[in-house]
Amino acid sequence: ITCSKVYGDIISCVGYIKGGPIACVGYLKGGPLQQYVHN
């Protein structure tokens, strides 16, 4: 599952299906951030 880039600084992204929306966890330079995107 691919996730949208945030500020183009996402190093890695793990996605999983959760109740319809895709919950993505991306790790930035400063730390983790959680974003929700729809496929």
Curated annotation (Swiss-Prot):
Homology family: Belongs to the plant LTP family.
Keywords: Disulfide bond, Lipid-binding, Transport
Record's protein name: Non-specific lipid-transfer protein
A GO molecular-function descriptor: lipid binding
Entry superkingdom: Eukaryota
Reported function: Plant non-specific lipid-transfer proteins transfer phospholipids as well as galactolipids across membranes. May play a role in wax or cutin deposition in the cell walls of expanding epidermal cells and certain secretory tissues.
